[in-house]
Amino acid sequence: MIVPVPLGDRAYNVHIAPGLLARARTIIAPLTARRHVAVVTDSTVARHYLEPLRAALAAAGLSIQPVIVPPGEASKNWRTLETVVESLLGFGVERGDAVVALGGGVVGDLTGFAAAILRRGCKFVQIPTTLLAQVDSSVGGKTAINAHAGKNLVGAFHQPAAVLIDPDLLDTLPPRELRAGYAEVVKTALLGDAAFFDWCDANVAALLAGDTPARTHAIATSVAAKAAIVAADERETGDTRALLNLGHTFGHALEAQAGFSDRLLHGEAVAIGCALAFRFSAERGLCPSGDAVRVTEHLSRAGLPNHPRGIAATAAPLIAHMLQDKKMRSGTLPFVLASGIGHALVARDVPLGEVEAFLDRVLAEV
């Protein structure tokens, strides 16, 4: 299956198929001028998939030059970025070459940002190995590292030359990370596809249990939705792409409060953020309270957190993190809220005092 991302001279295809890693040479070989392919991955993914990728590319006469970074969100920093860039320069990577990102969202963000600044821009290919990366971060061209002030505050838009999604790579993913990735699937349904949310309700158990057709359908539906949004608003200059931030304003603040650590995975933060966005929308009279309850219950059934308890004692530190959000404009922070399941909207008239009061009420719950 191929999902096109139509962006003029930056257009590319997202290839989705079980077993695709073994056929990676057919997509990667035409994209690189050298016989050596630089591959950025992390030490966990390398143990499972570096050799299969090496074998797949060897069939086309290509060898790999690996750059292996530590796993986890903590690697999205200046130091690791410098390591990646200097390694790629040491390999002699040129503009006509394609660097491969083999890993989850952290590896994809690091590699994409390195490719964006290397020789003022070289090609890169995404081979996402987590559900979160397959359904969200590998598509759309957002690349970034974290700063002390907050998440994804240093980065660039740099579209990949191709994305290769193999659902079979999820077989080695720890259950917690699989569930965290599923949060982005749910987010896709919540922001614009009520029928897809119904499908998620009926198929979440099968997807998490390893059903390949269910996983492939969830991935393809999510990718197609994101591709359409990116094509309409590539650089988030309007409200269309901003809808993808459903759950992220709350979520990023929670991640920052948790120290960008394994204490709270990104997808878990998004799950809590989506639950909060629907509760807040219901309190403001935008959304039926029944929809907010349904979202919370679905996340619980998926084994995902839906409440910020244990992350912060009061709202004040979360609001402080929100003030560093990259979406801030003239001191105003837009929130993605909802009028119902499948109907997200951007609200630009939300006083932070109202948000703080809401969060304090939520955090006071036992």
Task: Please give the residue ranges for each predicted region.
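ATP/NTP phosphate-donor binding region
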Residues: 1-98
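Solvent-exposed alpha-helices and their adjacent loops that cap or buttress functional pockets
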Residues: 6, 32, 91-94, 117-119, ...
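Non-catalytic interfacial helical region
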Residues: 85-100, 111-126
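Short glycine/serine/threonine-rich phosphate/pyrophosphate-binding segments
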Residues: 106-113, 134-135, 252-253
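A glycine/threonine-rich phosphate-anchoring loop and its flanking beta-alpha core
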Residues: 113-206
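C-terminal charged capping/lid subdomain of soluble metabolic enzymes
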Residues: 183-185, 286-366
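Active-site segments that bind and position negatively charged phosphate/pyrophosphate groups
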Residues: 203-316
